[in-house]
Amino acid sequence: MRKVCEVYLVSSASSDERGVELTFPVSQYEMMDAFEQIHTKSPGDVYWQVDEFYCFDYLAPHLDESMSIFEFNSLTEQLSKLDERQETAMNGLLQMQVNKHIRENNGPITTQELMMLASNVDHCQVLADVHSNEDLGKFYVENGFREDLDALPDSAYALLDYAKIGKQMRESEAGAF
């Protein structure tokens, strides 16, 4: 399991301002030990902040302030198991969710949504070397995904607007780069 981030924890209920730094995700025992070190037993009394992301730093602006330290640990545990392709999918899914929230004026992304996105990365198609609408359009045409274009003579392919085809396909599938 790879490490996702460094997190600083301190008890907001204790007069002792000493905190503890942990590398997440952590085990249940590491969490219990940290709670002992900051002199608290209640997760509601724990103030925490991410000091440094080792990966998934694009999540930082989307972390819900009401997320408990246990929810955050669970999220980082899910994230730590993702491979490079799945991490790319997670980034794309997050972009799509952010765009949906903006369109629908839904406010910030919730902890539950982040957990759902992380668990759905295997249901995404990640295309290597496709970084633009034009690349996507070429991919669709060259791989026969646009059956309406199969009847065209080879000489007509040079006249196609691949960027427009790619944009149409990306938008119809709610995709992201």
Task: Describe each region flagged by the PLM.
Residues 14-16, 27, 98, 123, ...:
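Generic ordered-secondary-structure signal
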